[in-house]
Structures are given as structure tokens and as C-alpha cells.
Amino acid sequence: MHPRVLEVTRRIQARSAATRQRYLEMVRAAASKGPHRGTLPCGNLAHGVAACGESDKQTLRLMNQANVAIVSAYNDMLSAHQPFERFPGLIKQALHEIGSVGQFAGGVPAMCDGVTQGEPGMELSLASRDVIAMSTAIALSHNMFDAALCLGVCDKIVPGLLIGSLRFGHLPTVFVPAGPMPTGISNKEKAAVRQLFAEGKATREELLASEMASYHAPGTCTFYGTANTNQLLVEVMGLHLPGASFVNPNTPLRDELTREAARQASRLTPENGNYVPMAEIVDEKAIVNSVVALLATGGSTNHTLHLLAIAQAAGIQLTWQDMSELSHVVPTLARIYPNGQADINHFQAAGGMSFLIRQLLDGGLLHEDVQTVAGPGLRRYTREPFLEDGRLVWREGPERSLDEAILRPLDKPFSAEGGLRLMEGNLGRGVMKVSAVAPEHQVVEAPVRIFHDQASLAAAFKAGELERDLVAVVRFQGPRANGMPELHKLTPFLGVLQDRGFKVALVTDGRMSGASGKVPAAIHVSPEAIAGGPLARLRDGDRVRVDGVNGELRVLVDDAEWQARSLEPAPQDGNLGCGRELFAFMRNAMSSAEEGACSFTESLNGWR
């Protein structure tokens, strides 16, 4: 193992000792009760099986076969989740064939950030992660189940499913993806039309035609945003079957992987003599493995929030400092849009997960000695699935990249360091996705222009007020202010300014989409402005340095003057309409971005 990876892992283990121990005690107490439906009073159990067929009723009464919960984020507006419509039938059939039972335990909400970008609904996006976690807990709280299958793909859905199911860590749990849609027009072409539209050089009809040629079929969007990062990290955690992440939907291989996930969940139950609860899989080593994979592929910045919240749900204390230290020793091995021109289907064809995991294991950057849903040891994830006469089998994946413009071996990385940079200075702490920014654009020092929402920046751009070197500051966008929306709609405007030769950067206490790139952006700045963070002291014209090379985020103002400044008050309008008022209690409970921007942080860490 690489000494820095070991050092960071041991530090996390030491820091987490108390909370992890308390978590494991909770899990063991739940596991010791045996099949939970066996402890239910007769009337309660009768309610739980009332809608089952006679065969399933008899199986569930005997308590000697697994009852597998299906928790699904299906809806047919969200392209990535539309394929889940068929999955419960496939799962139940596969379980019946081995004498087990599957029950649809509950549905969880799934919103599409692509639909809500720049709209009021985006202010519910991050909160939806915590709603999904609570919905998962409600689904599993009936205590009818011996194992669980979680069906989810997209941005906040998988983190929410993870947080919720980890609170039922005594259950063996397998995550079931749907797979990416086939490749449409190139991401480069799509981005170019967006930028032309921002400049007034493309019509709305041309923009819509471009967008619909990109997002065109059931399955996950093909850029390397949060949804595909979710799949990659869950597989590296050992919660997917090997190679399951990026098989296209509605194919024979995808259907057989879904059936096998159901069978495997049943095999991992005490009833089948091979008990592997989720809590044994998601430990400190698995969390470190997920961070390493995130860094090696330049994954979504949203996971600098989500991984912290997921770790907390397992009693593990992960920090941005841990991620930063790992970023200095983990090389960048993948170039997927927005970090390059390839999409996730090209990544899969170039060698995909099996090649990536093999390289990171051989380089001592991943812990091999972990438990997974496929069995002990991460080395089994260097295999890939295929069908042999209709039967699902695994073979060794490629030992060399099939396209080094997309995926490279450890000895020829795209960069010696990972794709994320911790930003620090007198403006607070934040993160930057440097893998998506050309080296010549990673350092910007310029006067600031301050905005309190995306619409104001767009209006200033259209009025020609931003034609200069510029650090755009969009503040009061943090978790407690307005739910920390993504500010992805700013990317075309700032990209135009950069292409015109201006030095441009963004600084915000909000988020950017995992699809954002090109323009240097110090995001998730903490403390947020509404909590008295330094961004609230900034004034138009202040000179700010955003240095993605050295991780510096600093206002160049005399210290005495800076400390004497008053804090700008937060805008009083907003947070009303589109249901936003219903989430006020959740915003008030949100922890800082550095703590995962999570409404559960205080209660989960209360065990410390």
C-alpha cells in the first residue's frame, strides 16, 4: 500500500473510533434478533404478508428463506431511472426461482437536476438527498426483511439510498444500477451550442435540437457528472456486482445482472449461511477506496459533500483534509467529459472499471483487503461480466487501456495528482475541480463582481457589464441560505468571457454541477455567507486571488480593514414557492459544506 493512503486511512480510523464503535454496536444489536418479522406480533406479520401470494405467505411464515426488500427510485420522467420500471418483476422472478421472496418495500423520490437547473426546484435538490435517506429508512423500518436491493442512479438519489440503508447496516444490501443511455452527439458539440446560445448566436430551436440529440434515450446521461460518479464509487465500495455500473439498459446483459443482484442479496443472508451485512462492507477502507477512485477519475465535486455525509451514516469521520492529502498522491487516470471529450460509454469501451481498479490496486492506492457483495477482496472487481450461452459469467478485464486518450495506466497518467484541490485562505475553505480546467486558466487574480443569484449574473453578462478580467462571486447560495443549489447555468456565460481572452473565475458558497468545467470555480466555500462567512465581507471591486495550483483563495485587502468590515445581510426574498417553504426546517438544520451539508450531521455525530 502507498504509505500516504495507509496514513490517511489510519487517521480516519482513529478519529472515528467512538462513532464507528457505537454504529457497529447498533448494527450487532439489530442482527442478534434474527429475522425481524419473526419477532412481530401475529397481527403485524399478517399485515405484512396480506398482499402476497399463497406460496410467498408460506415461505415468509417459515422464516427459513430470505425476504428481500426492493427500495426503488423509479420514475419515468428521469431517463436514468425509467429502466427501473421493469426491475421489480425481474427481481421477484429471480428470487422465486431460488425459493426466496421479494417485496417492494418502498419508493423514494428522484428529482432530475438536469430539469431543475437554474429553476426554483434546484433549491430542493440537495435537501432531496436527506429526504431520500429518510424515505429509505421508512421503507426498511417495517422489519420484514432479511436483505435489501437499492435501485438508484442519479445525483442525490444514490447518496440518499446509501445514508438510509447504512442505518440498517445489519441487512445485506446490493445496489442495482440501470446503466447509461447510448451515446448521442458529442459533449463538445453540445457545450458549443450552449455557448453560442449564451452569446445570442444560436436560436432556442437550435439549442433544443442539440440538447435532445444529447439526452435522447432511457439511461443515465453520458457525461461524467454526479450520476456516473455515483456508479463508479458504489462499485469501488463493493456494493455493485463487479462490472455492473456501465452496462446499457434494456440489454440481455443488464437484465441478467439485475437478476443476479437479487440472487446474490439472498445468498448473503443468515438463512443461506453466508451472512455479509452492509456494515461490514462500508468501513473506513471502503470509504478511502471511494475517495481514491473519485480523485483518479476527476469525479463530481458533489462528492466532497456526499462522501462526508455517507461516511457519517456509517459512523466514520471523513474530512476535506483527508481528501486533499489523497489528491496529492493519486494520479488522474481518466479523461471523461467535462475533463475530456469522451463519454462514459467510451470509458467503458476503453477498459472501464476493471482496468481502472486493476491499475489502482497494482499501484497500492486501493485497499484490496475489503469485503464486497461479491465476496472478500477487491481484486475480484478486475473482472467484467458477459453472457456465455445466456449464462452470466465473469472474465478477467483488459490489462491494458484500449484508448489512452480516455484511460491510462498508472505509469502514464494524465496528471500526477488527483482532480480535486482544497482551496484555503482568508475567504474560507472550498474545493476546485482542477481536472476540468486547463493549466493556463487555473490561477486568476482580478476584481470581484458580487451577485446574490444566477439571474443577476446572466443579466449583467447580457448587458455587457462583465467584459473584463473578473472574479464573479455568487454568495448566499449555501446549505442554510437557500439549500445550496447548483449554479451550472453560469458556465456558458463565464466560458464566453474566458474565450474572449479575459481572466475569469467563480467563487461561491453554492455548488456547481458535476458536469461543470472549463472555468476555475472555488465552490462549497465554508463558512457560508449567511453563517457569517468571509464572503459576506466582500465588496464589489475587491481584488481576489483564486489559485488552483497552490490551493489559495484570498482577498487582497489590508487585514485591519478586512476585519473591521461589516457583514452584508442576506437577501430577504426567495425561499417561497415551488415547495421551498416546506424545507425551511431542513435548511436550518444543515451542517456546513465541510461537514457534508447534511441535516443529520448533529444527530449522527452526537455519539462522538
Curated annotation (Swiss-Prot):
A Gene Ontology CC term for this entry?
A: cytosol
How is this protein named in the record? Phosphogluconate dehydratase
User: Pfam families in the record, alphabetically?
Assistant: ILV_EDD_C, ILVD_EDD_N
The taxonomy runs: Bacteria, Pseudomonadati, Pseudomonadota, Gammaproteobacteria, Pseudomonadales
Q: Which family does it belong to?
A: Belongs to the IlvD/Edd family.
Origin species, per record, is Pseudomonas aeruginosa (strain ATCC 15692 / DSM 22644 / CIP 104116 / JCM 14847 / LMG 12228 / 1C / PRS 101 / PAO1)
> What does this protein's UniProt record list under function?
Catalyzes the dehydration of 6-phospho-D-gluconate to 2-dehydro-3-deoxy-6-phospho-D-gluconate.
* Co-factor requirement: [4Fe-4S] cluster
What pathway is it annotated to? Carbohydrate metabolism; Entner-Doudoroff pathway
What's a Gene Ontology MF term here? metal ion binding
Catalytic activity line of the entry: 6-phospho-D-gluconate = 2-dehydro-3-deoxy-6-phospho-D-gluconate + H2O
Q: Which residues hold [4Fe-4S] cluster?
A: C154, C221
Top enzyme class, one word, equals lyase
